[in-house]
């Protein structure tokens, strides 16, 4: 990987939780390619995790942000403008839902959790994109993360699947809005990875095994796989790509049924 690919570029990473996060894989790939990074966090508990990781990548810009609060989002970008005069890329790796409502039936989703899930997991990308646009006068790239549960029904995903479907639609509309200004907007649909967010999904080990046995590549992806694909979408290598949902899932999304050589899996 060329360490000059992202030289001179500055990017904001939102949603880093720990060194198992997909956001960490993306941040590492961008940093290794020469990018200068800033990070946001929500709450003191996450600051204790994010700050040391930011320092590993040579960043001292770690700023608070509650994406559910419009004033907090504005304050984040005001603080970022005090440090940088421009922003070249944005990574939105944020989603949340009450894990108790991811089990059982989608039809039993409460109104409160539905609204909260859509606000944090979907609208937040639009909110931060609106602020980031102002720091991209010469164009840039925005990226969010989604999952195959937006396209097909997946176990224990429920309202998050609905939210990710809305997020994918948002990517297309944002791409249209911002394209005339040279700003590209894309998504990565990553296969299942053991992350903090995944811990709220029931039978996740079963999902991992199923994906491994039935994907064309016969393996699960990892954060480095996603990081390298994100680097492509965030760099000038993808200068003609916008409104795209790139699947990084070992090809699982093309499969129509269980592979003939896949062993049976018992739920644990």
Predicted feature descriptions by range:
Residues 215-226, 237:
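A conserved structural motif in NAD(P)-dependent oxidoreductases
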Residues 185, 189-200, 248, 254:
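Short, flexible catalytic-loop segment of classical short-chain dehydrogenase/reductase
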Residues 54, 65-74, 78-83, 92-115, ...:
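Conserved mid-core segment of classical short-chain dehydrogenase/reductases
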Residues 3-39:
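Canonical Rossmann dinucleotide-binding motif of NAD(H)/NADP(H)-dependent dehydrogenases/reductases
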Residues 231, 242-268:
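Short C-terminal tail/terminal secondary-structure segment
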Residues 15-24, 95-130, 134, 138-180, ...:
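Catalytic loop of short-chain dehydrogenase/reductase
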Residues 31, 85, 136-137, 176-181, ...:
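A short hydrophobic alpha-helix cap/turn motif
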Residues 179, 184, 241-243:
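Short, small/polar-rich loop/turn modules that mediate ligand/substrate recognition or access, typified
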């Amino acid at each position: 990987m060329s360490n000059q690919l992202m030289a001179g570029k500055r990017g904001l990473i939102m949603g880093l939780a720990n060194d198992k996060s997909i956001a960490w894989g993306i941040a590492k790939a961008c940093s290794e390619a020469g990018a200068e990074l800033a990070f946001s966090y929500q709450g003191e508990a996450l600051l204790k995790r994010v700050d040391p990781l930011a320092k590993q990548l040579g960043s001292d810009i770690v700023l608070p942000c509650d994406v559910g609060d419009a004033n907090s989002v504005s304050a984040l970008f005001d603080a970022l403008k005090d440090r940088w005069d421009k922003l070249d890329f944005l990574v939105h790796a944020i989603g949340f839902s009450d894990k108790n409502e991811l089990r059982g039936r989608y039809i039993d989703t409460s109104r409160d959790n539905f609204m909260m899930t859509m606000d944090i997991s979907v609208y937040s990308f639009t909110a931060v994109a609106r602020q980031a646009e102002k720091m991209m006068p010469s164009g840039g790239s925005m990226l969010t993360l989604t999952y195959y549960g937006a396209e097909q029904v997946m176990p224990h995903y429920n309202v998050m699947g609905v939210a990710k479907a809305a997020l994918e639609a948002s990517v297309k509309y944002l791409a249209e809005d911002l394209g005339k200004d040279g700003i590209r907007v894309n998504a990565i649909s990553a296969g299942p990875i053991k992350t903090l967010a995944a811990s709220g999904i029931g039978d996740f080990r079963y999902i991992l095994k199923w994906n491994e046995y039935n994907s064309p590549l016969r393996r699960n992806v990892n954060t480095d796989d996603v990081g390298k694909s994100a680097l492509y979408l965030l760099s000038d290598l993808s200068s003609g790509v916008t409104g795209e949902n790139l699947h990084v899932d070992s090809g699982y999304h093309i499969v129509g049924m269980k592979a003939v050589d896949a062993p049976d899996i018992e739920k644990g």
